[in-house]
Amino acid sequence: MFTLKKSLLLLFFLGTINFSLCEEERNAEEERRDYPEERDVEVEKRIIPLPLGYFAKKT
């Protein structure tokens, strides 16, 4: 039981660190973008491939 708690605590701690690093990187990317057109293209890249990839795998 004790080793299970230690393992879960370690996973939670590492996950929290990983999430905070990803969030910092994402914020840095958003700050680097100067033009709103670039931001719109990035949003399209994130949204559109997901449904297209989903339907492509089903056929």
UniProtKB/Swiss-Prot annotation:
It comes from the Eukaryota. InterPro entries: Frog_antimicrobial_propeptide. Expressed by the skin glands. This is Dybowskin-1CDYa. GO terms for cellular component: extracellular region. The lineage of its organism: Eukaryota, Metazoa, Chordata, Craniata, Vertebrata. Keywords: Amphibian defense peptide, Antibiotic, Antimicrobial, Cleavage on pair of basic residues, Secreted, Signal. It comes from Rana dybowskii. The keyword Hydrolase does not apply. It is found in: Secreted. Antimicrobial peptide. Has activity against the Gram-positive bacterium S.aureus (MIC=6 uM) and the Gram-negative bacterium E.coli (MIC=3 uM). Lacks hemolytic activity against human erythrocytes.
